[in-house]
Amino acid sequence: MGGIMAPKDIMTNTHAKSILNSMNSLRKSNTLCDVTLRVEQKDFPAHRIVLAACSDYFCAMFTSELSEKGKPYVDIQGLTASTMEILLDFVYTETVHVTVENVQELLPAACLLQLKGVKQACCEFLESQLDPSNCLGIRDFAETHNCVDLMQAAEVFSQKHFPEVVQHEEFILLSQGEVEKLIKCDEIQVDSEEPVFEAVINWVKHAKKEREESLPDLLQYVRMPLLTPRYITDVIDAEPFIRCSLQCRDLVDEAKKFHLRPELRSQMQGPRTRARLGDNEVLLVVGGFGSQQSPIDVVEKYDPKTQEWSFLPSITRKRRYVASVSLHDRIYVIGGYDGRSRLSSVECLDYTADEDGVWYSVAPMNVRRGLAGATTLGDMIYVSGGFDGSRRHTSMERYDPNIDQWSMLGDMQTAREGAGLVVASGIIYCLGGYDGLNILNSVEKYDPHTGHWTNVTPMATKRSGAGVALLNDHIYVVGGFDGTAHLSSVEAYNIRTDSWTTVTSMTTPRCYVGATVLRGRLYAIAGYDGNSLLSSIECYDPIIDSWEVVASMGTQRCDAGVCVLREK
């Protein structure tokens, strides 16, 4: 061959694997093996050099002056023969078979023999199995075996799913110290302190004799001043454990004082009056009618922790009069009006993907709908009413994302566009709207078990284009248009008493406004004040019955879709 050829190092991808396969064949045929591991009276021939290369435990055993250094047989204590077989297979093949049945033996054995690859595989498997019923046990198991990443993952999971976790036996069986550690944590994700209080009471009731004296110590970590006055008087005051304890009564009195003496709140600041930080909810605003007097495709995200707005990928079609919901880490944008016609199409964004992900289409509704109401119940999306360009609808349909299919349900009693749709205690409520002739104050509710709509007490004010959201046990209706004026007024419906009360008005009139709840507060988003499109956002605190303006969006709009999503 002519010319000068430079030398080159060439690495093959199969060499190491080929050697491992050959050594495994030698092991299985007991060829060139120079040590036998004995576990539970069962012998496992092996090669010292292979064991030492994979395990610091065996490396120390065979290279130091330990008694096992030159012995042909080594007894291994603290693990079973079946586990030893799995570990040896890993040493010679790089593959480990982890199951629910073997992981509790495999992980401690991997720690004992210092097989880092097996330990990591077990931790990854357990993390994939995290569930509200087992996360506390996995956290303790991880802590016992110094699996720091797994322990942190289990801890975060228990915080994120606190209301579900406390329903399971693992929580009830915790020690007082473990309960304290969990409920004092700022990061637990709850919509209010109600599930925290109820978790403490249920834990005490499980073993009343032994645990009753622990109640005052635990109750100091429940942020009772952040509970509603009604819950304090109706639920906490009625709890026998509370009435029987002077220390508990003092904590309840502190909460009442916080509500009754607002002028003293600045002096009462402390851990019990501080909102928890763990709720990673963000607010999403999609589409709407923009400042160019046309539908828009802009999507913005608000983080209440930083009070900052950022942009997400635009929807594929410009839409006003649009509805939006979130379900299982996905954002759905439903119906609307593109400037030419009312739409039945639905777009979806998988929020578990990167923020440069793309919107994709799912099955369209059976009916074209603009200004429809949308909500979620269980694993389903419900959409009712709306305007198709020629008539207002009484119909409601339901979307099942598992089969990507819409189905028609029972009709409302009144045709409505611009109505609000919300779920409370498993019942769907439709509020206000416009029937083609009149602005409505009527409210009807749908029972999914019977498939029927019935009327409930109407609102005090006729409203179309109002924002609707559930906070604690009240449905709040904000702003809208009454046929004459754009409204700033707000009223709240008590689902227990079927009655309405008026609360403090917003600082700005808002029609075609979005409403949702974030971290225990009600948000009113953008809208139209009768003169201008708005980018401003207001936040209502039900504890002090007061609104405050928070950071404005980058886009002025009304008729937008609004939803809340929990970030990972």
UniProtKB/Swiss-Prot annotation:
GO molecular function, one term: ubiquitin-like ligase-substrate adaptor activity
Stored SMART domains: BACK (SM00875), BTB (SM00225), Kelch (SM00612)
Kelch repeats: 282-329, 331-379, 380-426, 427-473, 475-520, 522-567
InterPro entries: BACK, BTB-kelch_protein, BTB/POZ_dom, Kelch-typ_b-propeller, Kelch_1, SKP1/BTB/POZ_sf
PROSITE patterns according to UniProt: BTB
Known role: Substrate-specific adapter of a BCR (BTB-CUL3-RBX1) E3 ubiquitin ligase complex that acts as a negative regulator of Wnt signaling pathway and ER-Golgi transport. The BCR(KLHL12) complex is involved in ER-Golgi transport by regulating the size of COPII coats, thereby playing a key role in collagen export, which is required for embryonic stem (ES) cells division: BCR(KLHL12) acts by mediating monoubiquitination of SEC31 (SEC31A or SEC31B).
Record's comment describing the protein's domains: The BTB domain is required for interaction with CUL3.
GO cellular component terms, A-Z: COPII vesicle coat; COPII-coated ER to Golgi transport vesicle; Cul3-RING ubiquitin ligase complex; cytoplasm
Compartments in which it is found: Cytoplasmic vesicle, COPII-coated vesicle
Residue ranges annotated for the BACK domain, each copy included: 135-236
Domain of life: Eukaryota
Region annotation (Interaction with DVL3) ranges: 405-568
Major subcellular site: cytoplasm
Keywords, ordered alphabetically: Cytoplasmic vesicle, ER-Golgi transport, Kelch repeat, Repeat, Transport, Ubl conjugation, Ubl conjugation pathway, Wnt signaling pathway
Keyword Repeat annotated: yes
Subunit-level organization: Component of the BCR(KLHL12) E3 ubiquitin ligase complex, at least composed of CUL3 and KLHL12 and RBX1. This complex interacts with DVL3 upon activation of the Wnt signaling pathway by WNT3A. Interacts with DRD4, KLHL2 and SEC31A. Interacts with PEF1 and PDCD6/ALG-2; interaction takes place in response to cytosolic calcium increase and leads to bridge together the BCR(KLHL12) complex and SEC31 (SEC31A or SEC31B).
Domain BTB residues, every copy: 33-100
Protein's UniProt name: Kelch-like protein 12
Pathway named in the protein's UniProt entry: Protein modification; protein ubiquitination
Record flagged with keyword Repeat: yes
Maturation and modification: Ubiquitinated by the SCF(FBXL17) complex, leading to its degradation by the proteasome: ubiquitination by the SCF(FBXL17) complex takes place when aberrant BTB domain dimers are formed.
